[in-house]
């Protein structure tokens, strides 16, 4: 009897030690993608940073840091049921802060994409912005929303709310812009991003997400074998500095992606637009603009069988094929070296340089109005 009691006590002591190291301190459990929350605990510009983990009922997982509102990882099953990380990024806050312009997974604003010559005129007043890309303003400048700390509140296991007050004059933009972004990991394995914003002075707004996707599940691979479809009859051609010059049909050009094509098939075609972009880096004008229920784009990896569908209520979609990813390689999560064209971005948006091109849909937001936008990245297999 004494031996039995002793055995039970020993077992209880052993179980009570689970989750602790040799010194008795609680050990940290990694996320599905191998991230450690402690690697994101810091302070930037005097504000705390952290990693937030979203999980749905099917076992999928998405991780977001409030520095830049960045989507750090998305774990979804491949055709064999293996959980696979489909976005690029870093595994600690220090790397993100050291490399802000890579924009991995970042929220982008106040104006996503380019504004020509870093200036625009609104209601008779000219506003000068940072010129951080060939004399133009790209993604709100070097200190855009991708490089600030957002206030974060985890609503439930599947939902994260981020808020940020972009002050009047920040990066040259007029008006105090009060922004709310909701990340939700739905039970059908979709990352649903909803944006809201209000202003106290007329301004321009174009918010988006700059996640880099590679669906293959092969660390360090390119996306040249992925297939892509974009439901768009027209697109914005650009000049040598990637400023739109108008609207043209995709028919008869390598920009025709209305039926699925292999990304690498025409990416190095001497077609002038692909030469200017160094590959695909253009805005497609969506046929179902404003309809969140229609598939705007579809990407498939033949290796993993993972499918990503994009839904949005925005009129445009920027397809960027990782042309500027360094050929020398960037070391990302778990030490993986990211190659040239190691991922693609699908950024839902209004057209680039709209503040200077009155024929494009308006991006002006005035007091009393509410800016709303939504982007859904939905994952499945085939």
What are these regions (language model features)?
Residues 5-10:
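Sec-dependent signal peptide hydrophobic core
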Residues 1-4, 19:
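Positively charged n-region of N-terminal signal peptides that target proteins for export
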